[in-house]
């Protein structure tokens, strides 16, 4: 595995997709402190201020294109389990995979199923004989609050973790 940590990039996905096109080996991970052009599924904007975890992974799985939906599920479940392990016990059951590409926080007392808060977005892009797996996790709130559009109200992992 090769980890590259960058300060500020347009998109970690674009860096990994370029590496895929160049024939780079599986295992490259690109992480950025901030992204100016982060995006999710169907080109939706992923706000990426300092305080989150934004990374992309280069994979070359030995599966047919139809197997990518299974890969998406496996990645989603792995991220969900990792976030649950970091959360206080009372918050763990509320961290859920929202198919096909989100990890959300939906406590039992949530009045409606569509009133969840978004913890993480995951994207899968086939490119250059491989797959770019993009993961964006809301860890800490930004220093300057950002306006929230649509239903993607963020939930920050720091609020669900033990302090100290």
Descriptions of predicted regions:
Residues 63-65, 69-95, 105-164:
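Long, positively charged amphipathic alpha-helical accessory segments at protein N-termini or as interdomain linkers
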